[in-house]
Amino acid sequence: MLGPMDEFPVHQLPQPIAWPGSSDRNFYDRSYFNAHDRSGDIFVISGIGYYPNLGVKDAFLLVRRGDTQTAVHLSDAIDQDRLNQNVGNYRIDVGEPLHSLRIRLDKTEGIAADLTWNGLFDVVQEQRHILRTGNRITLDAQRFAQLGSWSGHLEIDGEMITVDPKVWIGSRDRSWGIRPIGEAEPAGRPADPPFEGMWWLYVPIAFEKFSIVIIIQEEPNGFRSLNDCTRIWKDGRIEQLGWPRVKIHYTSGTRIPTGATIEATDGDGNPVRFDVESKLP
């Protein structure tokens, strides 16, 4: 079970890198990306994931143009070469770790892509995400996030779309740990109290001089179990923005959000306000 990474002094346990430190079937190691132009008329999401205790890896790329979605999903048996991230016709090449990478999808079901990511700001390490159902940990993950620009092209059903870094931006995150994946496990005795869901807000924003990454997780009773609001400056400084107060705006009579007002506080106690508007109709 050895792989190329085992040549390097990066081990944290007395076992090969490809063996996860946990035997939990839900252990995962995954990347997520999104890309869009500033008009909001086109949106792209993509990702790749490794699930060593399930023996599989998968990837996807989805493009939304107007009201049309076109997607490709790929899956394969896992391998031990984690430096060569690929699933079928999909691959990720890391140029400069934590700064630049390239996503390529050879033509598959009418979709092809060649997209290069360049971070506009440094990555930010988020707080550890932990969630329990009864006595059991169902989510225990580490993530980092980044805002950046995209360049390259997409091809969809014969249409070539140029991705210009002057107008194409997005966010990405890397996460690894434990979270529910794949088929549902036997439930066992029902949890007491039962899991009633959670409220989740994720807002990555890129400005000219800084980026913002906001993650808030609340239980049904409003208890905030994750509060992460940071500002990442061009020079690499990372500033916490306190305990944000959030007001979600909805379409009247529905649960469809149209935007949000987020009020935070900088290190000197000055208010920092963000008005977020949905580009979806």
Task: Kindly give the residue locations of the regions a language model identified.
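Structured soluble/peripheral alpha/beta segments that form catalytic or ligand/cofactor-binding pockets
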Residues: 1-281
